[in-house]
Amino acid sequence: MLYGEKYDQLYFASTRTPKGAGKDKEETNSAITGQRNNDLFLVKQDENGAWLAPVELEDEVNTEFDEGTPSFSKDGNTMYYTYCAQDPEGPRTSEIYISSRSSAKWGKGTRANIVKDSVTALGHPSISPDGKYLYFVSDAVGGYGGKDLFRARVVGSDFGPMENLGPDINTPGDEMFPYVRDSVTLYFASDGHPGMGGLDIFKATLDSTGKW
């Protein structure tokens, strides 16, 4: 995720062993890939346009479990990201977490209160530039296929009901990785729409009636 007025900051997820903050924290490997779980990193450009060494985000965000797919509020002080814990006694599921930045440091991530249960998977958050809606992926009951795209209105520190983006966006396949460019333009990946094979990138535009 590129960020900054000059797009000179890049936030990304990686399984690399960190060299900076958090390197001594307890770690676990993914039960799916067997690799080290993903953490979030930041890399910046210097005044000459060269990328500096990546730095791991604070332990308040990165844990021994998976973190990924960050999205930022317009002022850059709120980060939404995917958090996926491993529970030996139950299914592996993903949730959306929120972290606030103060004095150039990210605070402890907290669960976004979008669903009441702990079974429905949520992930790949993308906050609209105007801050009104959070777009995300879910396997919630009543969708059109495997994983669908949803959105929820941001109401202060809470969220309104989940809204499925409908059959023009969602298919019997999987739709994932939404990115809202300007509050009316949505980019996403899908293996259900006709394409080149597997996940392809698609674009949709919101019309004046609120329909994609």
Tell what function each PLM region has.
Residues 1-212:
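Short, conserved micro-motifs composed of acidic
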